[in-house]
From Swiss-Prot:
Gene3D superfamilies: 3.30.230.10
Protein name per its UniProtKB record: Small ribosomal subunit protein uS9
SUPFAM superfamilies cross-referenced by the UniProt entry: Ribosomal protein S5 domain 2-like (SSF54211)
GO molecular function: RNA binding; structural constituent of ribosome
Keywords: Ribonucleoprotein, Ribosomal protein
Region (Disordered): 115-136
Pfam hit, one: Ribosomal_S9
Gene name, Swiss-Prot/TrEMBL: rpsI
Residue ranges with Basic residues bias: 117-136
Length: 136
């Protein structure tokens, strides 16, 4: 699905959130260089699974290696941060071309995953786990 587009500005921004992570993504015309918090993505995310997850919007829109990605991400763990980066990239791609919306929406890349860890309640071991109850 090769969509032709005219770049309106040099940088395209997107904000993504997942669990307690917030990612600010900037896409620049380039060769596919991926940096997270001024470090190389492989060095930061460590696992190829997280990197593949974060770059999924590029696979769907067939725009691999056409943009340099600069990300500032805070909070949460690596899985949450990868999910936040994925949403940020998808939103930044929409700024480039609105034609990507149908492809990204169909793959649920534009939907914020609102699931957040439930808090621990007093008197319980975890959020819902209680001690074993004996009736007699």
């Amino acid at each position: 699905m090769a969509i032709s587009y005219q770049l309106k500005s040099p940088a395209f921004r997107g904000l993504g959130r997942r669990k307690s992570s917030v990612a600010r993504v900037i896409l620049l015309k380039g060769s596919g260089k991926f940096t997270i918090n001024k470090r190389e993505a492989k060095e930061y995310l460590k696992s190829d699974i997280y990197i593949k997850d974060a770059l999924q919007p590029f696979d769907l829109t067939q725009t691999n290696n056409t943009f340099d990605i600069r990300v500032t991400v805070r909070g949460g763990g690596l899985a949450g941060q990868a999910g936040a980066i994925r949403l940020g990239i998808a939103r930044a791609l929409l700024e480039i071309s609105a034609d990507y919306r149908s492809v990204l929406k169909e793959a649920k890349m534009l939907t914020r995953n609102t699931k957040v860890k439930e808090r621990k309640k007093p008197g319980l071991r975890k959020a819902r786990k209680a001690r074993q109850f004996s009736k007699r």
